[in-house]
């Protein structure tokens, strides 16, 4: 049986973040040189160990990659080694099965410069060489806008289409041909890959030229080379659209219980979306089917060893039983070491042995209360990661302007009503703060739960108008009633009051109720608000402070579980609600009038609020698109600032709020649809997200620290120093720079013979195709070299027989030439 060798164990580095790659050779794991990372042969299988540094520990992902022409034995060995490596890591890794052509975004993301799939494999003598070599002739089809994959295709114009980028690699010259319908970003990615091949594989001693498909006449020398190597230019195929995955499929979750009964796989459906963590028992194994797009296997810590060891084979049998494609992605999750992607398929995911955030979290029902650490406003811009965690750009002491929507227009709110938010209204709040000498803006759009649809629409429209007035600089934050973020509360210094309904308009004819009850939550000036609840006894809670306002009195009711800080903040906000003297009432010592005002005694929540297991929140970045008329979100694993492209829009999900980042060159439709797109994301999220989650719209160049803090080493000057595609193209030079090299490539001697040909003096005689095909040596015409039959053909016959020009044939690897000659009867 295949075993992880002592040599592999000895060389295995499990403490340093980064990649390690092995190829399966003669059923053994053989290390791949780091200089060739990102280059894979389609006849082989590989194992990739990715180590990531998290806040307090390391996480591990093991991928095994299956080339389309690899043998079943190699595939089996790769799977076994993956399991053994996970055992060596004591079950701390997530295992991934990757099949050529259907690699996960996480896998592609490891190779930022591009993933190159080459023909051949170890069985045909193909090696991962470190030395510079110019003996290369191939055509690479580059697919993808972000994490690109480049595969070798037939060296012929018929391989081309109008929508993609192609690299014609001729050793000393690489020609990048851009389809006329390819995007700027696809061209930039293609150029990055071409330069990577030049610098890493050829030591920088290769020319790179670019041909734009819509203007081929501008590159006559390069087109001469292409036509020489690829044959006569032909009509191009139409652009091939990228595979589109419907959001509904991603959201279609089914959880199955797995058991291995007497060697037979038995699966039983347990639940469908939305899923909760308590469905997973530590004693069992489960399969989670994400609409057939991806299969997850979860192994409970106390499950029997046979079931745990057979996790991957269970998944493959499940795929077969469901008649899913063999290339379906598989992830094996260990109990306690689950990936962020897996965790966020559940409504909430907690880990009892982890600490998260900046304070202890307590909960009753679905309401959480955070014991805040001391707030330090000076740290927000120096340490944006603190700003991101606390969701604070400063301490709320900046300048504020507030408007209310009236008759669909903006009307300034009288100063005496600042901090009062009525559920029947919508408000716009513009907050101005300084970083150094520069002004920055936050634009809050607060929408009451009882406001009319016209007012809600008008609030969004007026936000756009106000945003334009300030040159698009404000960060827009949509705040549904009840979802007020800490910074908004901090502006009112502990005096924010939210009313169930009503309005503060001067012409309001409705009178508010004579008795009102407010639940106060918060421990300091930066996190306190009073929220109106129905004035009934059953809405009390022993863990909080409540303000009960009647016509004759104002009570401050203190539950047994509230803290001293909460009582002090409640006194402050109570002064905003009522000017009358407050009567402090301790739970259990209420006067009769108190209960009478609430309509009589009634049971209410009086159990001690328990400490919640720490909620695990991993920020996730998605590239968004609605160009097809459907919302698409592509996740970017291990993201950093470089992943934010100026042409696109992105969504940063930090669970209790969602940022929508707009690049300055994004198309207008995507800019206008920012809020709608973010809401669509929440609606189609597999875990069943709260549609009222706050949405924050951020424009490139005006990012607040609450956003930048989620990125490692954010550079505010990045885009001012970044070179455009046009700049990079200009740096490559023009056709005069490589005239000598193009002359070498187009010289007649390479028309028929390749570099390995055993050339005789003078040209070989030409014979008709039918006199050479499937003929034994004794039946060949006189003068024919039996080992070089193809060189006795005319160019027309050669092209007819092989489906390509002699030059294209000569560019193929030696093993493929031999296979083609056998196939065509010319061996």
Curated annotation (Swiss-Prot):
Result of altering residue 555 to F: Complete loss of phosphorylation and interaction with PLCG1, does not reduce lamellipodium or ruffle localization, inhibits cell migration. Inhibits interaction with PLCG1 and lamellipodia localization
Reported modifications of this chain: Tyrosine phosphorylation is induced by epidermal growth factor (EGF) and stimulates cell migration. Phosphorylated on tyrosine residues by SRC. The unphosphorylated form increases the initial rate of actin-nucleating activity, whereas the tyrosine-phosphorylated form inhibits actin-nucleating activity, enhances actin-bundling activity and enhances actin-severing activity by reducing high Ca(2+) requirements. The tyrosine-phosphorylated form does not regulate actin-capping activity.
Family the UniProt entry places it in: Belongs to the villin/gelsolin family.
Outcome of substituting residue 725 to F: Complete loss of phosphorylation and interaction with PLCG1, does not reduce lamellipodium or ruffle localization, inhibits cell migration. Inhibits interaction with PLCG1 and lamellipodia localization
Effect of residue 815 to A: Reduces interaction with F-actin
Keywords recorded for this protein, A-Z: Actin capping, Actin-binding, Apoptosis, Calcium, Cell projection, Cytoplasm, Cytoskeleton, Phosphoprotein, Repeat
Effect ascribed to mutating residue 715 to L: Reduces the Ca(2+)-dependent actin-severing activity
Residue span of region Headpiece: 735-827
Protein name as it appears in the record: Villin-1
Region named LPA/PIP2-binding site 3: 816-824
Organism: Homo sapiens
Keyword Aminoacyl-tRNA synthetase: no
Gene3D superfamilies linked: Severin, Villin headpiece domain
Annotated positions of the Phosphoserine modification: 366, 735
Domain notes per entry: Consists of a large core fragment in the N-terminal portion and a small headpiece (HP) in the C-terminal portion. The core fragment is necessary for both actin-nucleating and -severing activities, whereas the HP binds F-actin strongly in both the presence and absence of calcium and is necessary in actin-bundling activity. The Gelsolin-like 1 repeat is necessary for the actin-capping activity. The entire core fragment is necessary for the actin-severing activity.
Subunit structure: Monomer. Homodimer; homodimerization is necessary for actin-bundling. Associates with F-actin; phosphorylation at tyrosine residues decreases the association with F-actin. Interacts (phosphorylated at C-terminus tyrosine phosphorylation sites) with PLCG1 (via the SH2 domains). Interacts (phosphorylated form) with PLCG1; the interaction is enhanced by hepatocyte growth factor (HGF).
Chain positions covered by the region annotation LPA/PIP2-binding site 2: 138-146
Annotated segments matching region Core: 2-734
SMART domains for this protein: GEL (SM00262), VHP (SM00153)
Gelsolin-like repeats: 27-76, 148-188, 265-309, 407-457, 528-568, 631-672
Localization terms from the record: Cytoplasm, Cytoskeleton; Cell projection, Lamellipodium; Cell projection, Ruffle; Cell projection, Microvillus
Region of interest: Necessary for homodimerization: 2-126
GO molecular-function term, one example from the UniProt record: cysteine-type endopeptidase inhibitor activity involved in apoptotic process
Domain of life: Eukaryota
Record bears the keyword Calcium: yes
